[in-house]
């Protein structure tokens, strides 16, 4: 059996396939599409409770926003998760890459504060804001 055959057809996969939380045919790099994003800590631990750590997390959000040319309209740090309203700005860089970079930065930052291993869940929750939804209501 060749490696490329594993997980296809009648050959069972060695590992279970994870279901993706993303829409199959949606362009996550589409400019000016606004996403409501929730990024959770692993095990719902309350990791966003230290003021000094949170100040640096805000710096990570700003740094990643500039690095990949995404807008971050508003964000809210809660004890065990972060909410963001964000969108690509004509960069062609998908929201998944923005969130991957942000997650990496926050995790590395947390190591300086005594955390070890993974800090955040593997993925994030997103909701595409449709034109008929009230962006102001969601932001509040």
Identify the residue ranges that each predicted region occupies:
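Short catalytic/metal-binding and nucleic-acid-binding patches
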Residues: 1-140
């Amino acid at each position: 059996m060749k490696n490329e055959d594993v997980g296809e057809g009648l050959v069972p996969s060695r590992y279970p396939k994870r279901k993706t939380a993303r829409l199959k045919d949606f362009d996550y790099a589409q400019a000016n599409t606004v996403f409501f994003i929730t990024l959770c800590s692993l095990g719902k631990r309350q990791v966003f409770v230290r003021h000094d750590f949170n100040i640096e997390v805000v710096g990570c959000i700003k740094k990643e926003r500039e690095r990949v040319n995404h807008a971050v309209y508003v964000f809210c740090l809660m004890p065990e998760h972060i909410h963001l309203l964000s969108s690509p700005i004509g960069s062609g860089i998908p929201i998944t890459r923005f969130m991957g970079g942000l997650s990496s930065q926050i995790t590395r930052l947390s190591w300086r504060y005594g955390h070890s291993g993974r800090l955040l869940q593997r993925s994030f929750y997103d909701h595409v804001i449709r034109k008929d939804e009230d962006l102001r209501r969601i932001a509040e």
